[in-house]
Design a protein with these regions (language model features):
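Surface-exposed amphipathic alpha-helices with a cationic face
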Residues: 110, 133, 165-175, 256-262
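Active-site beta-loop-alpha junctions enriched in small/polar residues
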Residues: 88-90, 121-123, 143-147, 183-185, ...
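Generic structural signal for well-ordered alpha-helices
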Residues: 69, 103-106, 129, 164-168, ...
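Glycine-enriched alpha-helix->loop->beta-strand junction motifs that scaffold or abut catalytic
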Residues: 134-140, 200-205
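Conserved Radical SAM active-site core
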Residues: 1-139, 147-151, 161-162, 173
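Conserved strand-turn element in the central/C-terminal portion of the radical SAM core barrel
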Residues: 157, 169-190, 241-245
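Auxiliary Fe-S-binding modules of radical SAM enzymes
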Residues: 2-15, 194-305
Length: 305
């Protein structure tokens, strides 16, 4: 496919020698990204740093490279390994309906016995329920950091929160492990307790991560806060300019209380496998995960003040 522009998105084909990349994430294993770029265009996206390595000069969210790779010849190589699909893209972008890269990847991982973790903001994943059930050890995680569709629309071009919640329920009801990834938690805006009560009966884990501001989007987010939430400016200044971690330390305590009050396990930086007792998902503290050294869930938190 030659370079084309569809609905304002620049799309082109790229060749890659190996679709599987050893992960440096605390959750360990391998990272797999069937696309370069992400058309959700989230204003807080840490993955925008990828532009440095791809040669793209277009704004993040306005380009998409469709990867082509040699077929995975020996899927058993990944037996027992965690394979994260969508660490710096979303495997279920709207364009996946046309290109089907993620479905092709899942088909190639048949028989691998890998632990597959899919990270998405889409409901297109329900298309692949048949494959997900066949693969066995699969987890599907949706990023949901608000129940306010207006705030969501300010931040990203992905499908509505309602559509994400509906997809989560369908996947959960199909017997597939699900995660509500409450991330990034925006100080003073994200109500993670309200989200917890919305999803507790349709997910196995609730995973919490703080908003990180770095690079070019730090100014954009702080400008947004000044414009839309001026009352929160002192809080954001304390956290993101003065590096005060007390706000999120308080949220950690709040999350632990929430877990105790609702008879939910509470863990630090782990991603335990298995299904939770219905209505009692595991709450995972992933705040300031850079404090955790090591990977493959063997790291230990080294708190900073």
């Amino acid at each position: 496919m030659a370079e084309v522009k569809e609905s304002g998105i620049l799309i082109q084909d790229v060749e890659t020698k190996n679709i599987m990349t050893k992960s440096t994430l605390p959750v360990g294993g391998y990272s797999v990204n069937p696309y370069v770029g992400c058309t959700h265009g989230c204003k807080y996206c840490y993955a925008s740093f990828m532009k440095r390595f791809t040669g793209h000069t277009e704004p993040w969210g306005t380009f998409l490279d469709v990867k082509h790779w040699p077929a995975i010849k020996n899927p058993q190589k990944y037996k027992g390994q965690r394979v994260v699909i969508g660490s710096v893209t979303d495997g279920y972008l709207p364009q996946e309906a046309q290109f089907q890269n993620t479905r092709k990847l899942l088909e190639q991982l048949r028989g691998s016995e890998a632990e597959i973790l899919i990270c998405t903001k889409s409901d297109l994943v329900i298309r692949d329920i048949d494959l997900l059930k066949e693969l066995g050890k699969v987890t599907v995680s949706w990023s949901i950091n608000t129940l306010d569709e207006g705030f969501k629309n300010d931040m990203d071009n992905a499908v509505s929160i309602k559509r994400r919640l509906d997809a989560m329920k369908q996947i959960y009801d199909a017997g597939i492990r699900t995660v509500c990834f409450i991330a990034p938690v925006f100080p003073g805006i994200t109500d993670f307790e309200a989200i917890f009560h919305q999803v507790r009966n349709q997910c196995d884990l609730v995973w919490l991560e703080n908003l990180n501001l770095r690079g070019g989007f730090k100014k954009d987010i702080l400008d947004y806060i000044r414009k839309k939430h001026p009352d929160l400016v002192p809080l954001y200044d304390a956290i993101y300019n003065k590096r005060d971690r007390s706000y999120f330390r308080g949220l950690e305590d709040q999350a632990e209380r929430l877990a105790k009050e609702n008879s939910c396990p509470f863990v630090d930086n782990e991603l335990p496998y298995g299904r939770a007792e219905p209505g009692h998902p595991v709450i995972v503290d992933y705040f300031y995960h850079e404090e955790v050294r090591g990977s493959e869930n063997t790291g230990r938190r080294n708190p900073k003040k």
